[in-house]
Structure formats: C-alpha cells, structure tokens
Amino acid sequence: MRTCLIALFLLLSLVAAPTVRASVPWERLPGVNLTEADNGLRGKAIEIMKAENCYYECPDTVYSCVTKAAPAMTALRMAGVIVRLLVDGKTPDDISAELRNRAKSAHPFKKAKIDTSGMPRVGPEGSSVTVVIYADFDCPYCRVVSPRLIKLQHSLGDQVSIVFKLFPVKAHGPQSVVTSKAGWAAQLQGCFWAFHDVMYANFDDHDDDNIVRLANKAGCDLGPFKTAWNAKDTKEKLRTLKREGVKLGVKSTPSIFVNGKRYHGLKTAAELRDRLEEELDLVGR
C-alpha cells in the first residue's frame, strides 16, 4: 500500500512538472546579448533573481517567475535588466536600486497630466506611447539622450512619439535661456528638429552669432526666426514651460515622462528601449 502511495505521489509530481522550467530561459530575456553572458555571469544573475521580487504580474521572486512554463513578461524584462547591468559591471546593490526605479517608472502612484499640444513632436499624435523629455540645448547629457530617444522612435515606429519641452537650467550657463528661446523660435518657423540636430552637433558653439548660423543651416527663415527669438511672447512661453516642469517636479535635465509616468531609471539606449516596450505591453500595443 505504501509503495502504491509513493508511486501515486511521483506520478502526480510528474503531471505538475510542466508548470516549472528546468532553468532560466536565457534566450527569451529582452535586450540580452548571450555571447556576453558566460556561465559565471549567469550564476550571479540567478543569485540576484532569487533575491529580487517581481513587481508586476507574478507575485514571487524573479527567478521563480522566469522558470515557470509560461514566464511573466515583467519577470523576463527584470531578468534582462539584471543580466545587462552585470555585463556593464554593476553591483547587486546597483541592480536592486535600478529594479526599484524601474518599478516606480512603470507603476507610479500617480501619473502626470502633460499638455503636449503645439510642442515639437516626432511621431504621430495619439500614439500608444508618448514620451515627453524636458531638455536644454546647453545640457551635456541631453545632447546624448534626446537623439537617443528619437532613434528609438524611428526603430519602434508610430506606436511611439517623442515630445520635446524646453527647460533651460541656469547651471548650464547663462546662454541656456538664449538657446531655449532660439529653440522656440525654430518651432514657430517649423524647423525645430533640424535646429535641434545642429545645435547638439555643434554643442560648443552656442554664442549668438553661431545660433543664427546654425538656424540658417537648419533651414529656418532668418527674418522671422530673429523676430521670434527676441519676442516678448517667446520669453513668456519659456516661463510657462519652466513653471510647468517645476510643478511636475522637474529640477534637472534630461527629465523623461512615459505616458505621464516619470522615468527614474538609467538612460542608456537598452534600458530606455526596454521601458518603452514595457509600456507598449501595458497599453496592449
């Protein structure tokens, strides 16, 4: 009788077994280059997966969630973050902090309401995901992140749009207000994105004469551009944009919102892309 019960228990265990995988499905982790993840790194990744809880879809550790027969997409993304950051040399504490930031970015307590009408935009209005970046033409990191977001929009297509909000920061120098006013003048002339590109490509040449030269290079009509650049309405528009950003908690640039959700994570191309794809999953693409 005892032998029969043991046999029955083993049979039931086998029937239940398909709910768990034998190992992490490394090939399914988004944004992971498996050639960079040797066995030693994978072992470290598994340790972190066992220590971190999945923040959505699966109420268990990341490891338990990714080793199920049908792993939760959130867990797969979290595992991908872990591997990518280990490859980049981050510590377990760094990775834990980034995962917390990712959770806050994807599932905040409250979303911001941001008016994007009339703002510079790449991609269609009404896209599934709208990314708003508060940036400054004299901000060194904006020079990297804004073109990076535009490149991601080109890759992801019309599901995503990028909206640029001018937010001059005095710490970037007195010219930051001047270049932001020039940016709004370019927007009024319909040449903002070409101006955006030449301004960041010529980051160290933002005196007034060079701004005019770059506006001309961007195809702006210089007469109306100069008029708008120095107009009282342009100065007031910059004040309005600044007040709006401050009200949303923006203190530095670049600051990013994804469908009204403040982005707290790393601004590498891989992490930004993964966050945008996660948001597409959340809205059902």
Residue ranges and their predicted role:
Residues N39-Y55:
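Immediate flanking context of iron-sulfur cluster ligation sites
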Residues M1-C4:
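Positively charged n-region of N-terminal signal peptides that target proteins for export
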Residues M73-T74, V132-A135, Y141-Q153, K165, ...:
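C-terminal cap of thioredoxin/glutaredoxin-like
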Residues D158-V177, K232-K235:
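Thiol-based oxidoreductase modules, predominantly thioredoxin-like and allied folds used
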Residues N39-G43, I114-V129, H154:
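A short beta-strand-turn-helix
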Residues I6-V15:
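Bacterial N-terminal signal peptides
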Residues A51-T67, F137-Y141:
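Local cysteine-cluster metal-coordination motifs and their immediate loop/turn environment
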Residues S23-P30, K104-V122:
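N-terminal "domain-start" segment that seeds a small globular fold
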